[in-house]
Swiss-Prot record:
One of its GO terms (molecular function) is RNA polymerase II cis-regulatory region sequence-specific DNA binding. It comes from Ovis aries. It is found in: Nucleus. Belongs to the POU transcription factor family. Class-1 subfamily. SMART domains: HOX, POU. This is Pituitary-specific positive transcription factor 1. PANTHER family: NETRIN-1-RELATED, POU DOMAIN. Transcription factor involved in the specification of the lactotrope, somatotrope, and thyrotrope phenotypes in the developing anterior pituitary. Activates growth hormone and prolactin genes. Specifically binds to the consensus sequence 5'-TAAAT-3'.
């Protein structure tokens, strides 16, 4: 179709006049007849005429499908667009229309249900809780047995893992006052620390045990046994091996203990006599040297 210019002058009538309802709007042929009419525009306009509200068409690329509110379905747009693009040429869509979408309502309800399940506390009778309580009690007993305080454990962990570990952290773990998630994380750290502490303790005990074997434990002799040994010492200060064995059996002591007692008693007797002689004759040594 060829475009021919008008020979007569264009005529415009105000819209608010009485004759505006009967007279059509005259457009220039270059704006009306020369533009191609697309099928998509025809479909959108025909669909919009069947609805009671204006419909913004939402397209993505060259897809043939159209996202938006269609006739017989109140489904919102898949993508969110700025307000000025959605309202260009059409009034904005009312919010109640979008909020009544059953798909969105089901999704929100499912999301709230999952969030509620996440926030719900764990069952206190679950095996994980019982295992955590058992480890907390065992850790406290083994820590005390090794001779470590809560402060010692907190300082040791803080030196390796950071300042977030302290005596308060260990106290709250042993009293089950931490959250389940944090308690599980701390359990693994404390388990490793406990293993290393027990290894160090075993090496220390082995070293101390070797030193104790070199030096026997000091024996305590009762007063009655001392009196009996003093009487035997007055009678015989150098008893034979058979006499020492007989005295040990009578006093319920070891033979080595009785033998050592007589040796120590003779040494003490010698020191007493030497001290007494020096006190009685202080100048005896000088007198002998002068002679």
């Amino acid at each position: 179709m060829s475009c021919q210019p008008f020979t007569s002058t264009d005529t415009f009538i105000p819209l608010n006049s009485e004759s505006s309802a009967t007279l059509p709007l005259i457009m220039h042929p270059s704006a009306a007849e020369c533009l191609p009419v697309s099928n998509h525009a025809t479909n959108v306009m025909s669909t919009a005429t069947g609805l009671h509200y204006s419909v913004p068409s939402c397209h993505y690329g060259n897809q043939s499908s159209t996202y938006g509110v269609m006739a017989g379905s109140l489904t919102p747009c898949l993508y969110e667009f700025p307000d000025h693009t959605l309202s260009h040429g059409f009034p904005p869509m009312h919010q109640p229309l979008l909020s009544e979408d059953p798909t969105a309502a089901d999704f929100k309800q499912e999301l709230r249900r999952k969030s509620k399940l996440i926030e719900e506390p764990i069952d206190m009778d679950s095996p994980e809780i019982r295992e955590l309580e058992k480890f907390a009690n065992e850790f406290k007993v083994r820590r005390i047995k090794l001779g470590y305080t809560q402060t010692n454990v907190g300082e040791a962990l803080a030196a390796v893992h950071g300042s977030e570990f302290s005596q308060t952290t260990i106290c709250r773990f042993e009293n089950l006052q931490l959250s389940f998630k944090n308690a599980c994380k701390l359990k693994a750290i404390l388990f490793k620390w406990l293993e290393e502490a027990e290894q160090v303790g075993a090496l220390y005990n082995e070293k101390v045990g070797a030193n104790e074997r070199k030096r026997k434990r000091r024996t305590t002799i009762s007063i009655a046994a001392k009196d009996a040994l003093e009487r035997h010492f007055g009678e015989q200060n150098k008893p034979s091996s058979q006499e020492i064995l007989r005295m040990a059996e009578e006093l319920n002591l070891e033979k080595e203990v009785v033998r050592v007692w007589f040796c120590n008693r003779r040494q003490r007797e010698k020191r007493v006599k030497t001290s007494l002689n020096q006190s009685l004759f202080p100048n005896s040594k000088e007198h002998l040297e002068c002679r």
